Amino acid sequence: MQNLLDPAILFFVIGVLAGAVKSNLEIPPAISRFLSLYLLMALGLKGGFALSHSGLTANVGISLMATISLAIVIPLLGYWFLRRFVSGFDAAAVAATYGSVSAVTFVTAVQYLENQQVAYGGHMAAGMALMESPAIIMAVVFANTLRQKASPELIVLGGGVAAIGHQTIKQTVSIGKILHESFTDGAQLLLLGAMVVGLITGDAGQTAMQPFSGDLFKGMLCFFLLDMGLMAARNLPQLRGKSPVLIAYAVLGPIFHASLALGLAFLLNLPAGDGALLMVLSASASYIAVPAVLRYALPEANPSLYFSLSLGVTFPLNILVGIPTYTAIAQACL
């Protein structure tokens, strides 16, 4: 209940309500983009400053390996399960969306841990960056395999059916191109670059940047979550007519993924704060980076399916309920 009284969460609720009543409240796209980049830069700096104190320890390496492992296992399990209920292309797209991560969910979780005075490792921001790409690469591999097996006469495109030639179907999306775009993505570069800056500059850099990256952080997060609330509410109508199995997956899948993360954190003896963030990362779903890549990497998949599930169902649940729940469980078990 205390989490629901946090200003950032209340602004998210305001955004949801405004979107639900079809208010003309709107955050200009350019400002929304700036807020996103600001939060990533501030998060990277915060992680870098923390690493400058703790150093690159064995615990850091173990935590990062845990994030990579989950980034591989989660989309594999998701694809295996979803193939029973939707087309292979839609299964690959949804599995990639839920196998990747939401930066805003992670930022909100970091803020929650700080409010609760729960210690966590700054290196978990690097873990977030590492978890974004594996799911995309695996989805492209799945899709390329499906294209090779597809009929030369027919293929599904974004929920519709189109007749195309044999040669077109044999074309596949280049893994190299996907890798390049994943690792040169501006948001990831900014996050990792800011972390390096924080690591190099240490206490002096933290003092210099505090008025911008520290004092303004909460207010910027409130503004951004207001925008996310508007987007979530406006994407909910797209869920009408969708399979109940997919809705259930959007609710229960993240809980299962968080359980996997909890088990791994317990086996690796991770601290409660790191374990909570690992659970949040595993339970989150991408609604910006992955959908943007999937639109051209998997044109056969239905964008309204994977986008509306992640933003309309999973994101609000994680923000309102998931983060405090996962934190409490991590504190009790780790």
Spans of features found by a protein language model:
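Membrane-interface helix-loop junction between the first two transmembrane segments
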Residues: A20-L37, S52-H53
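Membrane-interface helix-boundary motifs at transmembrane edges
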Residues: N24-I31, R83-R84, I178, L236-K242
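Hydrophobic alpha-helical bundle architecture
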Residues: A233, Q238-L252, L262-A272
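Membrane-interfacial loop-to-transmembrane alpha-helix junctions, especially the N-terminal start
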Residues: R33-L35, A187, K242, L246
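Alpha-helical transmembrane segments of multi-pass small-molecule/ion transporters
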Residues: M1-L17, P29, L56-M220, F224-M228, ...
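Metallocofactor- and cofactor-centric catalytic cores in central/energy metabolism, strongly enriched
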Residues: S36, A42, I68
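Helical transmembrane-bundle signal
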Residues: L39, L43-G47, F224, M228-M231
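Membrane-helix exit/interface motif
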Residues: F49-S52, G263
